[in-house]
Amino acid sequence: MGSTEQTTEILLCLSPVEVANLKEGINFFRNKSTGKDYILYKSKSRLRACKNVCKHQGGLFIKDIEDLAGRSVRCTKHNWKLDVSTMKYINPPESFCQDELVVEMDENNGLLLLELNPPNPWDSEPRSPEELDFGEVQITYLTHACMDLKLGDKRMVFDPWLIGPAFARGWWLLHEPPSDWLERLCQADLIYISHLHSDHLSYPTLKKLAGRRPDIPIYVGNTERPVFWNLNQSGVQLTNINVVPFGIWQQVDKNLRFMILMDGVHPEMDTCIIVEYKGHKILNTVDCTRPNGGRLPTKVALMMSDFAGGASGFPMTFSGGKFTEEWKAQFIKTERKKLLNYKAQLVKNLQPRIYCPFAGYFVESHPSDKYIKETNTKNDPNELNNLIKKNSDVITWTPRPGATLDLGRMLKDPTDSKGIIEPPEGTKIYKDSWDFEPYLEILNAAVGDEIFLHSSWIKEYFTWAGFKDYNLVVRMIETDEDFNPFPGGYDYLVDFLDLSFPKERPQREHPYEEIRSRVDVIRHVVKNGLLWDELYIGFQTRLQRDPDIYHHLFWNHFQIKLPLTPPNWRSFLTCCEQNGPGISQECKTT
C-alpha cells in the first residue's frame, strides 16, 4: 500500500489588490520566497494557471511578441510556444499539454495557486494489466450515479440513490431501478459514496440497506466537511463507515484496490475514485468540477462521469433584471453546449477505452416544479457519445437500468454482441410515478413545529449559522407551493454586516438579495440544521438580487460551512418557556 497521503500545497498567494489588478490575458508572477515562476491567464469566464516551466527541457516562458491575440508564451530555450488559454503547446503542435494548477479564491478575494502533491498518486506501485476472463469484471447500471461492479469474487457499489427524493423534494429518479436493487446492495462487499449531496448520499436508500446490513463497509474520502456529518441526525444505523486519506491505494484483495481523490474546485466536499482490478483501471469522476486538480490517468479501461448539467438553481430560480425567460433559455442552451464540448474534449484527452455518461439521470417530477422541469433542460447522453465518437476511437456506452457491461469482452472485442447485455425486452426504463407523500409529510411536519411559534427563532438560527461581518442584506420570505407569501409565515430582514434583524433596509449602501422559500423546506432545513443545497440545488427558492452579483462567501457558508451539529432547539424552547409569552423576541440560548 502507498504511504504518502495526497495533500494540497500552496505555491503562490496573491493579495486582493493584486487580484484586482490582474489584466486580461497573460500575467507573470514570481514567488519571491521560493524563486519559482508562474503564469496566470485571465479571460472573462475563468482564470487558468501553470508553472512557468517548459515541458520540453525546463526553459522559462516569456511573452510571445508574435502573438497579437495575447494568448501564447515562448520558451527562451528552444522557442517552444504554449497557448495559455488552452494549456496546449502550439509549437510544435500536438506535442504536450501543460499541467494546470488549481486556482482558488480565499475569503478576502485574494488568490491561491495550489498543487496536489503527489500529483499522480496512482502511479505508485504500478501494475501491468492482466487478461480478464469473460464475466470476471461486470459493471451493471442501476440508476443515476449508482453502479454495481463485480470484480472477481468481490462486489462494489457506487453512490446508491435508489428511492425517494434528493435535495428536499426537488430531484426524483428518472430511471426505474432494477427490482432486485436492494438484494444487490446487500450482497456488496463495499460501497463508495463520493460526497454528501443527497443524490449520492441517500439516507432513504441507506435506511433500507441498514435494516438488512448495518455493518456493510462504506468508504468515503477524508473531506473537510465529513460525508456523514449528519448521520446521527438521520437516524440511520450504519456501523462500518471508513474515512480514507486521499491518494493512497486501499487494498481489498490481491487483485483489487481503489484510491479516492479530491476535487480541485470543491476539495472540502467532492471526491472521485479509481478502482483497479488486475491492473485495469476504472475511473469514476462523479460530480467533480476538476477531479484531482485536472490531473487524471490516461488510457484507463473504463471512464464514467457526469454529463447532464442542470444541478443548480441558476438561472431558473432567478427573476428581475436580465433574468427574462429568453435570457434564461439562451444561457441554459449555451451552458449545456459548453459542458458537452468540455466532456467530449476531456474524454479525447484522456483516451479511455470505454466511456459512460452517468450521474445525470434525475427529473423535477413533482407537479409544483413543472416550470423547472420545462426550463431546466439536460444534455442528452447519446449526443455526447456521438460527439466523442466523431473525434476519437473511444467506445461509448449509454447505460439503461439493469444493463451490464462485460469489461473483459469489450476490451478484447468491442463488437462482441455479449459485451453489453441490455435489460430484457419490456423492462421499464423510465419512472412514470413517484411516491411523493411519505417524503412531503416529513417536510410538512416542520411547518407546525413549536420552534416557529417564537419569532426569536430567527435570531437563534442565524447566530448559530455563524455568518457575519459581510456587507449583505437578505430578505427571507416564507411562501406556499407557488412562491406566494405563506399566510402567517415569516418575512424578515437579516443584515449580515452586524448580524442584526432590522425592520427596514439600512440607509448605507449595501447589496441586497430577496430569497423566497417554500415554507415546508425552509423550516425543515432550519429545524435540522441542514445545508442550503436543499433549497438552492433543490429549486425550492426564488431569488432576486441587486446588484446582480454572486455573493460567494455567503452562499458557500450556507451550502458547505454551517456547524456540524444542529441548533439546540430544546434549550431554546426551555428558555422561551421560562421567559413566558410576549418576550420571546429576546429569548436566546447560551
Swiss-Prot record:
Q: Name one GO biological process term.
A: CMP-N-acetylneuraminate metabolic process
Q: Indicate the transmembrane segments per the record.
A: none
Q: Which PROSITE patterns match?
A: RIESKE
Q: Which residues bind [2Fe-2S] cluster?
A: 54, 56, 75, 78
- The answer to whether keyword Metal-binding applies is yes
Q: Give the record's keywords alphabetically.
A: 2Fe-2S, Cytoplasm, Electron transport, Iron, Iron-sulfur, Metal-binding, Oxidoreductase, Transport
- Name the pathway it acts in: Amino-sugar metabolism; N-acetylneuraminate metabolism
A Gene Ontology cellular-component term? cytoplasm
Could you say which protein family the record assigns here?
Belongs to the CMP-Neu5Ac hydroxylase family.
What's this protein's name?
Cytidine monophosphate-N-acetylneuraminic acid hydroxylase
